[in-house]
């Protein structure tokens, strides 16, 4: 994907609605659109979706997504959303992975840029729970054990501790820079 990949339908609104929410991130962020679209249908907000597969939503000069992310900054400047939601499959971009990595300094730089552009509310969505192994295979293995009764509401065995570490790191960043933080990890794991 390049900087011209975003369809106009994602960023051009025809309503006079001054309240705009901009969703920025990768394909994991795109999952949030359906829920946000509810508010758009109700006429409360215009929702602008700028998501690109495997592109961390941070300003970083050293990634293949740099041109695309610069375009996001330009679109924020021109559309003036009141809220920007930043979300992604953060565990892919953790510094230990082989993907374009995201580090704390680049995330802070990105948030600072949004503030300079006049965004009044920035929401950082943290990582979702993940497991060391394939979750469906773990459930099949568990179902074959003598302890099996019913599928568990929550499965903590085999849970990736890296998710907890990353969630704590991102929550600390959000607190440090004064933005809202939503933790799917804490919500889904009843923490």
What is the predicted function of each stretch?
Residues 1-191:
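Extracellular/periplasmic envelope-modification machinery, especially enzymes
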């Amino acid at each position: 994907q390049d900087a011209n990949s975003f369809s106009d339908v994602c960023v051009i609104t025809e309503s006079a609605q001054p309240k705009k929410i901009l969703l920025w991130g990768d394909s994991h962020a795109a999952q949030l659109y359906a829920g946000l679209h509810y508010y758009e249908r109700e006429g409360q907000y215009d929702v602008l979706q700028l998501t690109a597969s495997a592109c961390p939503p941070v300003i970083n000069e050293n990634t293949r997504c740099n041109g695309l992310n610069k375009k996001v900054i330009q679109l924020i400047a021109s559309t003036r959303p009141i809220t920007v939601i930043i979300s992604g499959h953060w565990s892919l971009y953790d510094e230990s992975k082989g993907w374009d990595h995201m580090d704390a300094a680049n995330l802070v730089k990105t948030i600072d840029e949004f503030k300079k552009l006049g965004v009044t509310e920035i929401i950082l969505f943290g990582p979702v729970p993940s497991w060391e192994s394939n979750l469906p295979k773990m459930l099949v293995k568990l179902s074959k054990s003598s302890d099996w009764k019913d599928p568990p509401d929550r499965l903590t065995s085999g849970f990736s501790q890296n998710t907890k570490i990353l969630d704590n790191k991102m929550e600390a960043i959000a607190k440090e820079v004064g933005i809202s933080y939503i933790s799917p990890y804490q919500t889904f794991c009843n923490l």
